[in-house]
Amino acid sequence: MQKSPREFPRRGHIYTADLDPAFGREIHKKRPVLVISSDVFNRGTPFAVVIPISSIIPDVTGPEMVEIGKFKGLDKKSILLPLFIRSIDQKRLHKKIADLPKEKLLEVEDALKLVLGMVSLD
């Protein structure tokens, strides 16, 4: 994503991103991602912290996954995968395709707390 001085990816926006090359079982290829890093971070650095989105939904999902369904910009029922959170160069971001609804962003934050050990699983 080429950014002008005022343009930067914003928290809660969904972009297509190229996650290749990847190693081992990391999420890869061109796919939608959710920008989860703060606007201050995104504006002040060339990086963005993102969570990959997949349209392949397992039969059994856990609290570390967030189903986001299908909405404008995402034409397939999809799932966010906070376990695969990563920092990427903003140049990997391509087209903005959607905004994640606020209530879903709160679910993502809860899932991230589990993944990062910020809350107990008990």
Please provide the spans of the model-predicted regions.
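Conserved functional hotspots at enzyme active or ligand-binding sites that engage polyanionic ligands
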Residues: 1-122
